[in-house]
Amino acid sequence: MSKEKFERTKPHVNVGTIGHVDHGKTTLTAAICTTLAKVYGGEAKDFASIDNAPEERERGITIATSHVEYDTPSRHYAHVDCPGHADYVKNMITGAAQMDGGILVVAATDGPMPQTREHILLGRQVGIPYIIVFMNKCDMVDDEELLELVEMEVRELLSEYDFPGDDLPVIQGSALGALNGEEQWEAKIVELAEALDTYIPEPERAVDQPFLMPIEDVFSIQGRGTVVTGRIERGILTVGDEVAIVGIKDTTTTTCTGVEMFRKLLDEGRAGENVGALLRGTKRDEVERGQVLAKPGSITPHTKFESEVYVLSKEEGGRHTPFFKGYRPQFYFRTTDVTGDISLPEGVEMVMPGDNIQMVVELIAPIAMDEGLRFAIREGGRTVGAGVVAKIFE
């Protein structure tokens, strides 16, 4: 057992396999674990244990996902693999498994198929920043020209969705060959691991990003002023910092004159901590739940955006009937509901429970948002959908 396994000092990167059904995503996941365990040490995982993915509930949505881990000399990877297409759709939209990069698996025997395209589109919509291609089953194709053709098709398809199709790494391999211990194919898995190490940049840690805290509660403390509480999502809040209050109303700025946690006064609060922030000269009725406290200029409020939405099925506790244009549910962002109008893509009349759909949403009040922000769709407090902001309009 190599000592490396227990050192958590290496950078941690989240990846996952995406691509068409039966193109070998799970076989590749097993091949990566097995080959890298052999080469660098770590724990091998077989196909059956990965394929038998447990169901998880993320915001009431049932998703089957397998989580595996593996190491390269310079990094520790957490990798997600889903058994079914619907699981991928839900996973990507809810952000249940955030990916710093995706491994797109395309069988050389088939080339790009409908779900290949759909996963690339979803990756673009939900903001997967980097994609590496693993062309699988290359041991089944004798014709070198055919391999080149498939590679070209995949690159063109990625470019169509604004990924750098000409420049991203494409590895031609055989997951099954590697799993069976054939050296030429194991070498391709190592090549894939090297591509992960070099092509996907180390993700910026939450604590290094600009400060943001969704406001959950507001108190006024006699003689001290107004305190807002919440969990810091990213960055650091230091006493004396200027902060903006963004969303719902016009943006205002003020100074944080105190940070407290568990009734103790601190100099700062960091990402992941639940804190109270004392705001200078702010009145109790000028701030409300649903707004965010943020580094000035780092985030802006918006009302209109394009989103990718998964509509819960009846079995997941969602609607029993479809909805049509003119539907006006609540959109739950971070800590609060805001009513919004939707418009459906051209030619789409209705949306059935269990569908995923692109829709443009116009909220009745602005919310602090960036592309990639997740939200829930609710009717009277019951979740009926999950979505992600794909593109901001105004």
From Swiss-Prot:
Residue ranges of domain tr-type G in the record: 10-204
Function: GTP hydrolase that promotes the GTP-dependent binding of aminoacyl-tRNA to the A-site of ribosomes during protein biosynthesis.
G1 as annotated region, ranges: 19-26
EC number(s) recorded for this UniProt protein: 3.6.5.3
Positions that bind GTP: 19-26, 81-85, 136-139
Family according to the record: Belongs to the TRAFAC class translation factor GTPase superfamily. Classic translation factor GTPase family. EF-Tu/EF-1A subfamily.
Domain of life: Bacteria
Subunit structure: Monomer.
Positions of region (G2): 60-64
Family matches, as Pfam families: GTP_EFTU (PF00009), GTP_EFTU_D2 (PF03144), GTP_EFTU_D3 (PF03143)
Matches recorded under HAMAP family: EF_Tu_B (MF_00118_B)
CDD domains the UniProt entry points to: EF_Tu (cd01884), EFTU_II (cd03697), EFTU_III (cd03707)
Compartment(s) where it occurs, according to its Swiss-Prot or TrEMBL record: Cytoplasm
Catalytic activity as recorded in UniProt: GTP + H2O = GDP + phosphate + H(+)
Signal peptide as annotated in the record: none
Positions of Mg(2+) binding: T26
Enzyme's top EC category: hydrolase
GO molecular function terms attached to this record: GTP binding; GTPase activity; guanosine tetraphosphate binding; translation elongation factor activity
Organism: Vibrio parahaemolyticus serotype O3:K6 (strain RIMD 2210633)
Keyword Amino-acid biosynthesis listed: no
Protein name: Elongation factor Tu
Region (G5): 174-176
Region of interest: G3: 81-84
Region ranges (G4): 136-139
Xref: SUPFAM superfamilies: EF-Tu/eEF-1alpha/eIF2-gamma C-terminal domain, P-loop containing nucleoside triphosphate hydrolases, Translation proteins
